[in-house]
Amino acid sequence: MAEAKQIQALEQERIPRLLFNYAVPAVVGTVVNSLYNIVDRIFIGQGVSEYALSGLAITFPILLFLQAFGMLVGAGASVRVSILLGQRNTPRAEQTLANAVYLTLVTQILTIIPCYIYMEPLLRLFGASDRTLPYAMEYLQIVIPANFFAAFSFGYNAIMRASGYPRKAMTTMLLSALINVVLDYIFIYPLGMGIRGAAIATAIAMVICAVYVLAHFFLPGSVVRFRRAAFRPSWAIVRAITAIGIAPFAMQLTGSAVNVLMNRSFVAYGTTPEESDLAIGAFGIISSYAMLIVMLILGVAQGMQPIVGFNYGARHMHRVRMAYAYSAGTNLFFSFVGFAVAMLYPRAIVSLFTTSEPLIALCTTALRIGIMGVSLIGFQITTTQLFQSIGFSRLAIFLSLTRQLIFLAPALLILPRFLGLDGVWWSLPVSDMAAVGVAVVLIISRWKLLEGTEAKAADALPEE
């Protein structure tokens, strides 16, 4: 009965109402998920020091790298599950759920162990100085192993949402974030545990979230759940998961590479070692604010995903078009609001993270520059998610790479040569706006597919 109700809503509910029902929990979930890192940065910047904040920023490339593999499995499996449910193929959806467990185990073991062993040389490579390295090491020694649980919590939270439980997925993230915030405060202030306390708080929250999410798929009433018969390894299913998940994986992986490029640029173009360390901390603050906006946008796009995936699988192309149009419009609004707030109140935003006047002065100027491209980025992210949701992974990968690598890397190589440290900041809006332009061209060129007859459009559905 519950399964029929979820399926009927995806197929027949009015799109604005359906998108609201899916997007609100997804937005809360993604924004709350971003609070893992943001809350750590606020408590560390305010409760430890500005160099501890910079040390935390140095860890981003490693953490983004590890999270990329969770996104590979979670995003890929969730899209496949929603499409298969649209095709009324629940047994195959449950086999996809089971194979995602194997894939998560393998990817996490193969990535966590090397990152832990080579932690110090990696941090040095990523721009750590003698002032920031001890803080970065202390944090990662706890958080790297905990990312094993984060991969399951993120991946299966996405599948939970895609299979018709957006509110429960939201509750999971709220619970986890609340635990993280409370423990952050207790460990850093009353107990005086510093950055190590923040790491322990994050690790505990990750473990609890993973247990809660996985427990859902053992419940008899779940639309898809773990069944012993479904745990048959299938290379076809693994390929289908990775083919779709490769787009967000590439986006996250290039995000890691971008962080490395940015940090190395700060080291190269800072006038003193102290300025370089502060610039890395400033980038951490700017990334935190930008992450909040992007996660808000991504939440709407993720709310769109099961609607688009199901209706694409069910050959209801008019509903696919409507879901995309409403999502893109909503995200453009969020983009502009985030941009406007940063332009009007940059110092207030920066002061949330630090009381250091040199860091506040540097970051206030940098924030106004770096956030300019965010004004239209909601359209680019929504378009990327559309292509990912209907299985067009190559287009989604290309769009992901345009924003974070294809345009940003050349900008980082060229602009700082003429503008110095300011050129590093200007590379961010230049690459964002160029990526938006590419997204406009691609959606116009592919719109005929979504305007075609229901049967013809569905024939383009990628197979396992």
Where do the PLM segments sit?
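Residue-level signal for short hydrophobic patches within transmembrane helices
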Residues: P16-L35, V39, I62-F69, V106, ...
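Transmembrane helical elements of multi-pass membrane transporters/channels
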Residues: N21-D40, I142, S176, A205-C209, ...
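Transmembrane alpha-helix boundary and packing residues in multipass membrane permease domains
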Residues: A26, T30, I42, V79, ...
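Hydrophobic positions within alpha-helical transmembrane segments of bacterial inner-membrane proteins
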Residues: V31-L35, A75-A77, Q108-Y116, A151-G155, ...
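Helix-terminus/linker motif at the lipid-water interface of multi-pass membrane proteins
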Residues: L35-L53, L123-D130, I186-M193, L253-I286, ...
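Small-residue-rich hydrophobic transmembrane alpha-helices
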Residues: L53-I113, A150-A169, N263, A282-A340, ...
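Short runs within selected transmembrane alpha-helices of multi-pass transporters and secretion channels
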Residues: G74, V143-R161, A169-A177, A198-V213, ...
